[in-house]
A protein has these predicted regions:
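Charged, amphipathic alpha-helical linker segments immediately N-terminal to NTP-binding catalytic cores
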Residues: 1-16
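Conserved helicase motor core of P-loop NTPases
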Residues: 4-6, 28-38, 50, 170-351
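N-terminal pre-P-loop "Q-motif" helix
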Residues: 15-33
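Conserved helicase motor core of SF1/SF2 NTP-dependent helicases
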Residues: 27, 37, 43-60, 64-70, ...
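Conserved alpha-helical scaffold flanking the Walker A/P-loop in AAA+ ATPase domains
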Residues: 114-128
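C-terminal accessory regions
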Residues: 333-414
């Protein structure tokens, strides 16, 4: 199949020619869909055409009169948002939802450890049996617990559902895990290795980094941009980098589209510095802690008794601000709007309350009162500004312009 002339490959998508590698993977997945197997894995790094292949797969099924129900799913809300946008753009007749919603789960916090677990809300809310094909994208994010839940759901003998996992094993793994189980335990698979999505410099540098991910240090890069300077990457001194960064965040484009630009760094400390720098440039030095219209990102799950208001790394926009007191501590009562358009009420500690908050947590910990520890901690919501993100939190996102703090990124010892 590797030697197949591309002229022999039929046109599945108008104006898009599949490579011989993509065509081979497409045929392998189609064979899987006609088999009794339950699991299949498609791997490939950025630019190898995984998304195009998914588009081709669903389009070809419909062209052949196959009306099987399909759902696109991902572990995070952020990655699911990308899938939903893609499906709408291509007019695909599919559903899109998070893995939690698909399985009828709700995230809960173990009061003894503080770990996030998944709990079945109602077996009847498990939607896996309603679909013939479940596609789990960005599967590098799927941790061991979610992997078991997905496999158990699709392994029922009374349903014909099959599950296609899609991802890149070189992406960041789940927290406290070396690699997602998806890449270790699925027998049938196809791999895309040829970069085809990018025709310019970004594709070249991404391909180089991905292929040489084990080297001890990066080579010296030089700016490489298109003739009209609209695509590519720029290497510049910090002062110039910072000046352009400020210009980008104070532009009309960013005001109209919060996904227009982001800054990526490695350490939380550097992210905090960059967020303060950008806020000051936009609003001035005397600005309040929160401003209507600002974009926030959660550091941990935001809970309200038994309900999860926002997942970790979920973004939202501030639409209302009040002052208040909770547990005799001064707080910000924030009304926010999620990316799905839902309104949520968050309780965020004001800066003067932080020492007292930490002291009370330490007291509970010293006396081993863990249920009180977690109950008190969960009364308040931990959020950050979303101008700058760590590379880990940015995974699964799509931004138009990205500023990368390379010196800070190189502090990663791995």
């Amino acid at each position: 199949m590797d030697g197949l002339d591309t002229e022999q490959i039929p046109e599945v998508l108008p104006g898009i020619a599949l490579s011989s590698e993509q065509w081979a993977a497409l045929q392998a997945i189609e064979a899987f869909l006609q088999s009794q197997s339950k699991l299949y894995l498609l791997t490939g790094y950025a630019g190898t055409g995984k998304t195009t292949l998914l588009h081709a797969l669903i389009s070809r099924l419909r062209q052949q009169g196959d009306s099987r129900s399909v759902v696109l799913s991902a572990f995070s809300n952020k990655a699911t948002k990308v899938l939903r946008t893609m499906a709408a753009q291509w007019s695909l007749d599919v559903d899109c939802m998070t893995c939690c919603k698909l399985l009828g789960l709700k995230p809960v916090i173990d009061t003894a450890t503080g770990d996030q677990l998944f709990e079945t809300v109602n077996d009847q809310l498990n939607q896996v049996p309603h679909y013939r094909l479940v596609v789990v994208d960005e599967c590098s994010m799927v941790n061991q617990e979610m992997w078991k839940l997905l496999v158990n759901a699709v392994s029922r003998l009374d349903i014909a559902t099959q599950m296609l996992f899609v991802g890149d094993p070189a992406q960041l793994p789940p927290v406290n895990e070396l690699q997602s189980c998806c890449f270790e335990q699925i027998i049938h698979s196809s791999a895309l290795n040829q970069v085809i999505r990018y025709g310019g410099a970004i594709g070249v540098i991404a391909d180089d980094i991905r292929r040489n991910i084990e080297r001890s240090q990066l080579p010296t890069y030089r700016s490489d941009v298109s003739t009209d300077q609209t695509e590519g990457f720029f290497i510049m001194p910090r002062d110039r980098w910072q000046s352009l960064l400020i210009r980008a965040f104070t532009s009309a484009k960013y005001r109209d589209n919060p996904d227009q630009v982001r800054v990526l760094a490695y350490t939380n400390r550097r992210v905090k510095q960059l967020n303060q720098l950008i806020r000051t440039a936009i609003y001035g030095a005397q600005i309040s802690d929160y401003v209507v219209g600002e974009r926030l990102i959660t550091n941990t799950p935001c809970l309200d008794e038994e309900a999860v208001l926002l997942q970790t790394s979920e973004e939202c926009e501030v639409i209302g601000i009040k002052r208040g007191k909770v547990e005799n501590l001064p707080v910000w009562l924030l009304e926010v709007c999620t990316e799905a358009g839902d309104c949520r009420d968050l309780v965020v500690l004001q800066q003067p309350a932080l020492p007292d908050f930490q002291q009370r947590l330490d007291s509970y910990a010293k006396t081993l009162q863990w249920e009180l520890f977690w109950a008190f901690r969960q009364r308040f919501h931990d959020v950050n500004y979303a101008y700058s993100l760590t590379v880990h939190k940015s995974q699964g996102s799509t931004f138009q312009d990205v500023f990368v703090d390379l010196p800070n990124l190189m502090r990663n010892p791995k």
